[in-house]
């Protein structure tokens, strides 16, 4: 009759049967041997992993196995990209020379930025003198509208606009005529003036019958 060999206990059982196996597997010695066996395997595997990592670090100069990260930085941040410590704040940007930022390269028509005080500074070629300085010219006056006194001639070949009533300029298209002086803001002529609307006759005027006379 074949015998059963227990790998944990390294012994042969008397005979191969379910009752004998069950009795052996529930024994105290067998359980202790099973625990020791798996603990020994776990320690051996852990030690082998530690040895392989140590040897790889020693062979590659403490390099790591991840090719996506930079060399000599096992899982860290590349130099120059470290984060500041908490509470340190963001470092300020370095100031530009002269206080003005340089022009962006590649911009069309980019000219160098003039130094501070170039505009209006005396002795600078091309500088604009400040108002009131010797040789400074003020802003050119606004030209008068066509038709106003002192206005230049209009477009050649185009007759000048006709003056309005009273010598006033011609009103714009769709606009009302300008009222004469003393008429206020009301554009209509006063009663009795030429071209005014006839006024209503007063009550009881000659030629007007009593109220209701036209109903007879």
Swiss-Prot record:
A zinc finger (Matrin-type) spans 4-36. One of its GO terms (biological process) is spliceosomal snRNP assembly. It comes from Neurospora crassa (strain ATCC 24698 / 74-OR23-1A / CBS 708.71 / DSM 1257 / FGSC 987). InterPro entries: Matrin/U1-C_Znf_C2H2 (IPR000690), Matrin/U1-like-C_Znf_C2H2 (IPR003604), U1-CZ_Znf_C2H2 (IPR013085), U1_snRNP-C (IPR017340), Znf_C2H2_sf (IPR036236). GO terms for cellular component: commitment complex; U1 snRNP; U2-type prespliceosome. GO terms for molecular function: mRNA binding; pre-mRNA 5'-splice site binding; U1 snRNA binding; zinc ion binding. PROSITE patterns: ZF_MATRIN (PS50171). Belongs to the U1 small nuclear ribonucleoprotein C family. The keyword Nucleus applies. Keywords: Metal-binding, Nucleus, Ribonucleoprotein, RNA-binding, Zinc, Zinc-finger. Residues 70-89, 125-216 are annotated as: Disordered. Its main location: nucleus. Component of the spliceosomal U1 snRNP, which is essential for recognition of the pre-mRNA 5' splice-site and the subsequent assembly of the spliceosome. U1-C is directly involved in initial 5' splice-site recognition for both constitutive and regulated alternative splicing. The interaction with the 5' splice-site seems to precede base-pairing between the pre-mRNA and the U1 snRNA. Stimulates commitment or early (E) complex formation by stabilizing the base pairing of the 5' end of the U1 snRNA and the 5' splice-site region. It holds the Pfam family zf-U1. Residues 140-149, 157-204 have a biased composition (Pro residues). This is U1 small nuclear ribonucleoprotein C. It is found in: Nucleus. U1 snRNP is composed of the 7 core Sm proteins B/B', D1, D2, D3, E, F and G that assemble in a heptameric protein ring on the Sm site of the small nuclear RNA to form the core snRNP, and at least 3 U1 snRNP-specific proteins U1-70K, U1-A and U1-C. U1-C interacts with U1 snRNA and the 5' splice-site region of the pre-mRNA. SUPFAM superfamilies: beta-beta-alpha zinc fingers.
